[in-house]
Amino acid sequence: MEYIKIAKVSNVVLHRRGTATQGTLHLTTHHLIFESPQLSTEFWFPYPLIYGVHKNPGSTLLSKLTSTNQIQLEGTDSQNYKLYQGKDLWSFVNIKVIGKDYAVFSLDFGGDLHLQARKVYDSILNLTVLSNITQLYAFIYISNNLERKLPSPDSWDIYDPIKEFRRQGLDSKDETCPWRLSTVNEHYEFCPTYPSKLFVPRSTSDILLKHASKFRSQKRIPVLTYHHKATDCNILRSSQPLPGLINQRSIQDEKLVWESFNSFCNKDIRRTKHVIVDARPRTNALAQMALGGGTENMDNYNFFLADNNMGVDKSLKLPTVTRLFLGIDNIHIVSNTAAYMTEVICQGGDLNLPLEQNLIRSQKFSNWLKLNTLILKSVDMLLKSIIFNHSNVLVHCSDGWDRTSQVVSLLEICLDPFYRTFEGFMILVEKDWCSFGHRFLERSGHLNSDIRFHDNTMHSNFNDVDTNGDDLDIGVNTQDDYAEDDEGGEDETNLINLSRISKKFNENFKLNKKSLKFVSPVFQQFLDCVYQLLTQNPDLFEFNERFLRRLVYHLYSCQYGTFLSNSEKEKFQQNLPNKTKSVWDYFRSRRKQFINPNFIQRKRSGMNEHDQNLEEEEKVEWISPDLKKVQWWWQLYGRKDSEMNDELRHKRDSVPISVDKKSKEHSNSDGGKGLNLSIFGFDMFNRK
């Protein structure tokens, strides 16, 4: 409580979704709370959800200022803002809060509350910028009645790797299974950012794994993350290799990749090629060589063509190994793109002002959709290579915990209907994001930074604004006031966007790249891609859009412990399963709210026993993204579908998004030309 300089302020005006409400503001240790007789329920906002706070001179209504220094209102607005009539809008102090979930609200403090406004601002800063995760709400949160009544298993135990791989058709205890469970990382000493249980080829020893780890960034060796039973194909994941400038190689790493590509349950399935996927742009991957990293030298990994001492019988027609650069941008590009999108969407959100269409149409704003489209394009290519070529796939980026997690998890959603179910999606997140070390704490910025806070009143002089000697008052207009200018008066009542306060808002909104260097909405971007698949296949997902939206909220709310660590090791070091609750408690206890009523129950891939008829298994429908239908997630942004997507739908076919030809590379060192992954043309497989 020592962080709270003031706990309660009366007669504060809350502006939210275009509605002004006068009431009482409360500041608690973990939430900002606003109550008013005009509200049916209290408004609660958790501090970790804060994306930015701006303390500005004047009321937020100055954003509605017209060329005549009037706030022109009509209809219901007249009653909504009646409490401002006759008051000098510059006499107020406004605190505007932008949420990581795109919620925007502002608090107006009257002329006699300036000191209280300062204390509120300082208190919010103190309660938001923290030094340790134990200060977060999750560590004192007590489950409600619904969550306490949940049946077993405990939500922390919803993902059991042995059980999950058995569902996929792999029983590690069966000696005939080509994959085994390794405990080399049982105490996280082998690789601190990997899960304790690793599935590797049965033909490899733990000694080989230890030697191979020296050749991979962060020791994140290639391991199995998914087995597709219908095609007997495997998806592996790792980090980048470490050839460096002198082009080093590792026989053990090459052996591990070879054995992984050669570990089949069904040896009779014809395979044409396997794929090593580097999710980065080609130039970025090669530039990493100067830092000791890099990408695979395909002379060493194309086992049928290479002299690599793997004991490969070259008289056999073995599948070739192809390398593919996806060209997906890094976390810094994602962060900058999301920051600009947030600025455009959230400015004026407290007053529910319309989006500026010239910004919506801009190239810079649309970059977010282009990033997502490229990810989905990449997933589409890999999906069809697995389905039609029966290819094994190894995916990595730099460290293998951002772009790699996005690609492999989306690929699994497209391949396996189980991951499109309510519980299946939770297991997927636990498997490919939490256990494989996506840095949730770091990427989400839960401990925040004071760079998010902008006090624009520190050096303000309220008298330096030219108002022609008059106060800025609310002018309440009747129907007659607008009768004469019904057609021609629009220009005179347009909003002024160039006021000093608006400029300051825009300038201060930019993130400090140094202080928040590793904060990036990577997991949110993944959820956005899942949203695209859901809207394109509305009857093939058991969960609904609201499920994804609430997951974004609880990614940042810090009410639960699931997203408060950077790895499985950190989760247990912080004792999160015992000290906090799992986020899946929230969803499982409210299941009916998040179930899609249009979901068509189908036979789930690999869910039955191993003797399940394979022909029936192959009838299970896989899905692929329709790149022409990628759209804005308007529900998340609190905007109208027409406002964000109408223009996009009109020009949908005019600017196709594709992977750069330079991103496709043949496995031979002298190739370097574009390559079709499938022996078929991809464009002919638009069916779901």
Swiss-Prot record:
It is found in: Cytoplasm. Residues 647-672 are annotated as: Disordered. It comes from the Eukaryota. GO terms for cellular component: cytoplasm; membrane. Residues 155-637 form the Myotubularin phosphatase domain. It is an enzyme of class 3 (hydrolase). One of its GO terms (molecular function) is phosphatidylinositol-3-phosphate phosphatase activity. Its main location: cytoplasm. Keywords: Cytoplasm, Hydrolase. The keyword Cytoplasm applies. Residues 647-668 have a biased composition (Basic and acidic residues). Gene3D superfamilies: Pleckstrin-homology domain (PH domain)/Phosphotyrosine-binding domain (PTB). One of its GO terms (biological process) is phosphatidylinositol dephosphorylation. The keyword Transit peptide does not apply. It catalyses: a 1,2-diacyl-sn-glycero-3-phospho-(1D-myo-inositol-3-phosphate) + H2O = a 1,2-diacyl-sn-glycero-3-phospho-(1D-myo-inositol) + phosphate. Belongs to the protein-tyrosine phosphatase family. Non-receptor class myotubularin subfamily. Present with 1080 molecules/cell in log phase SD medium. This is Phosphoinositide 3-phosphatase. It comes from Saccharomyces cerevisiae (strain ATCC 204508 / S288c).
